[in-house]
Amino acid sequence: MAANQRKIVHVLWISCLLLLPSAKGHIAAVKKNRFQVTNTTRNGKFLFNQLVGLTSFLTGGNDSSEDDDDEGKTRNCTCECGQSNQENRIVGGRPTGINRYPWVARIVYDGHFHCGASLLTEDYVLTAAHCVRRLKRSKIRVILGDHDQSTTEDTPAKMRAVSAVIRHRNFDQESYNHDIALLKLRKPVEFTKNIRPICLPTSGKDPAGKTGTVVGWGRTTEGGMLPNVVQEVQVPILTLSQCRAMKYRASRITSYMLCAGRGAMDSCQGDSGGPLLVPNGDKFEIVGIVSWGVGCGRPGYPGVYTRVSKYINWLKYNLEDTCVCS
């Protein structure tokens, strides 16, 4: 470059109106913003995210049609997912071994336990959309590597603030359809023995007929107290037709949901957002997210979960800026 030449940086001032939706989907407010943009941003999607900042929180990230056709490209990294810390064993609503499932996280809101979550990458956790509805992002904290909420002596837990809330745009607060969300951690976590990511399931693969494991800090009985120690329970996963034949109204159970549970073996209040896991060889995959149900362990009312395999493309699209372990 000649000495008298200067590097040209294109500067564009953008003045835009940001429409803020209310809880019922109507426009609640209009905010005017002016942004300065240079040509140093790497692509249009990144540029737009940098401009708006909370656009993911407001719009739920990428919307998608049937089976999430808008496929993204995630970066595969030299790391492993789904590695538990102890051998599998059959349990029923009993405490787990310390950090047996190192991807299990808990969401704390305004200093209090709120929901469960699962670590997907070094800077994203997966949870239920209803868990983050109407929450102020600044008050959300994600705790990883924890086992017993009442003490800090058993495990070196890590706490992270949240920089973005990505809720599925089609989430229906009445039916709980598309009950899925991502939280981006403000600071990535380092993978250790006690903090590791979970594997995503194979798209289109039905886990029906398998035994799943629900992990979380939810109540062990309906109306009971929240436990300090993370719990696990094994539940049979039903087919869609089996679930629709139960006591739920058949139309309430969509293809984006799956059911699991039998008798007293069920997820309960407080488990929301946590994982339903199945083994795949020597690894675990998250096939469901605790979503909704009637009571806890009531006959004829199995727990209902978000079917994660339906959202692989949605997840890939929204995880383009991070590494997904395999």
Language-model segments: residues:
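C-terminal subregion of chymotrypsin/trypsin-like serine protease catalytic domains
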Residues: 2-20, 24-34, 38-41, 50, ...
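Protease-domain processing segments flanking chymotrypsin-fold serine proteases, especially trypsin-like
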Residues: 2-121, 125-126, 141, 145-146, ...
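Chymotrypsin/trypsin-fold serine protease catalytic domain
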Residues: 72-78, 83, 150-152, 158-160, ...
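Sequence contexts marking disulfide-bonded cysteines in secreted/extracellular proteins
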Residues: 76-82, 116, 130-132, 242-244, ...
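Conserved H-D interstitial segment of serine endopeptidase catalytic domains
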Residues: 83-87, 107-108, 125-128, 133-173, ...
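Extracellular regions of mammalian proteins, primarily the fibronectin type-III
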Residues: 101-103, 115-126, 138, 161-163, ...
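Active-site-proximal beta-strand/loop segments in catalytic clefts of secreted hydrolases
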Residues: 107-110, 120-122, 128-131, 144-147, ...
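Acidic glycine-/aspartate-rich tracts in secreted/extracellular proteins
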Residues: 130-133, 146-150, 186-191, 218-221, ...
